[in-house]
UniProtKB/Swiss-Prot annotation:
The gene is lspA. This protein specifically catalyzes the removal of signal peptides from prolipoproteins. It is found in: Cell inner membrane. The lineage of its organism: Bacteria, Pseudomonadati, Pseudomonadota, Alphaproteobacteria, Rickettsiales. This is Lipoprotein signal peptidase. GO terms for cellular component: plasma membrane. Pathway: Protein modification; lipoprotein biosynthesis (signal peptide cleavage). Its EC number is 3.4.23.36. Belongs to the peptidase A8 family. GO terms for biological process: proteolysis. InterPro entries: Peptidase_A8.
Amino acid sequence: MISLFKKLYFTFSRSSRIIITLVIIDQLTKWWFINNLRWKPGLMLKVTSILNMVYTWNYGISFGLMREYYQYSNAIFLITNMIIVCYLYHLMICSKTIGSFVGYNFVIGGAIGNLIDRFCRGAVFDFIHFHYRNYSFPVFNLADCFITLGVIILIEDYFSTKKVIEETSKENFDNLQIEAMAAKIRNTDHVSNDKI
């Protein structure tokens, strides 16, 4: 029982530092853009030929989806996001690899960053806008980057872990076959010796 508490404390303290750092980075960048640039919604700052900084409030979910239901759904978004964060935290505590631990931390940190916006401001502040020729990617923020990076880490971890498990299983299966053949040979030798 004590070892379980030690594991939970160790996991909580490590993950808390990562998550809090990501949330602080996200909230500081949003605060800086909102307060120092004194933009108005719709204005844009061209950074490069493919990157703009824009002032946008996202009243929907990721990438502005479902924003037309904002009046009815902000409370639902908040509750749903809190439930998802709690579930992801549970998965992170149960994670067996460093990759999944880090991936869940990034997803949780990004989700909490956006959750703070929705709770304190009623919407999520987005400011990063990539575009190329006629293609325009939806406006996003650093919390969205953290979530995306976390999902990529989790996917990579899943496939690399799956590969290791498959290789280990095949190796174990091959070893079992060799042991079975050796036992069969020993039994055959034993029977042959009995006949002599």
